[in-house]
């Protein structure tokens, strides 16, 4: 079943990438910012209050084509505004934590991320905020968490041993997790988890004992399986995060024009 899924994924990616291979598709649009700090903790990805701790609070709501029914949660983008008087050429990096439901902008940033697009001169960030909505360029970039491994967080709704809900934290690379399989440690009997909403995956068929995971991710133009052999102990608890022991570093190729692989500085 896993092999069949990977083959189907590779076919879909191949036919959806008819343009030249590219790591950094460049997009032009507009960005606004959240005027209320409370909105940052209620994003559709269901990260809750943890969202404000990602990338020093540089987070964003993205349009549906980026959010992708939740598979875009945790994706990283480099974004810069285009006002030559106020904006730096480097911009800032944000992580997707929410769905942008408006059609006025591609991204809605936290005010901290919005200000970080400004030039490093006194008052530039304040003047940028006054603009409200600005023209931007943005591109997908790998999420870099240094030496930190990916974490599996057990949601508060989980009930050992009958129901398990998880979300992935600190997912590196430039990929999307499109499927998750779960099995008892040492077993070859895998069952699939279902994406419930946002970044949350669930199952009511929880194997007994300690648990291992297989994550199917986009990588290059194909699907790749990342195996985390021992993640959750038999006595796993709701509300706790567990080290997955692995990190994703792959880059999923895109097909687009224009492509921008230059360093922004």
From Swiss-Prot:
Glycosylation sites noted in the Swiss-Prot or TrEMBL record: 100, 103
Record-annotated Expansin-like EG45 domain positions: 42-148
Localization in the cell: Secreted
Domain Expansin-like CBD: residue ranges: 162-244
Keywords: Glycoprotein, Secreted, Signal
GO cellular component: a single term: extracellular region
Residues in the signal sequence: 1-21
Gene Ontology process terms (BP): anatomical structure morphogenesis; plant-type cell wall loosening; sexual reproduction
Xref: PANTHER family: EXPANSIN-B3, EXPANSIN-LIKE A1-RELATED
Similarity comment: Belongs to the expansin family. Expansin-like A subfamily.
Official protein name in the record: Expansin-like A2
Species of origin: Arabidopsis thaliana (Mouse-ear cress)
